[in-house]
Amino acid sequence: MLAAAAAIVVLVLALPPTGAKAQSAQDRELLLKAAFLYNFAKFVEWPTGAFAAENSALTICVHGDDVFPVIAQAMNGKTVGKRSLSVVSRPRPPASAGCHISFIGANEPESSYVGHLKSPNVLTVGDRARFARTGGMVGLVTVDN
């Protein structure tokens, strides 16, 4: 009886905690990119008029359904100065109205965003090698992963 109880305790201790998820390599990479976006938000100075009010949130628009959940969760509850961060998902083509940072995921077709990169007061960040060459401001590129 004691051996059976000990075996049950060992099995219970070996189980992962409820709600625990293994982090994939892609999720770890997205968390790193979210950290870059957060640091960009901390160090960019937006022009007068970029915010509706002094206490308006800083909005990061994420274009790409495959990357939105991880980035949104990583930014949850964060602030930049006195501003809260708001992370929203935007459909194709990227609508940049109300965005301060526009992040375009690697799976978004180039044709869906190229014409929308010249929005005033918006820092455009893309997850592909040619992003900066096609009019984006910051291109995040993985080299020798």
Feature locations, PLM:
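Short hydrophobic alpha-helices and adjacent helix-cap/hinge residues
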Residues: 1-145
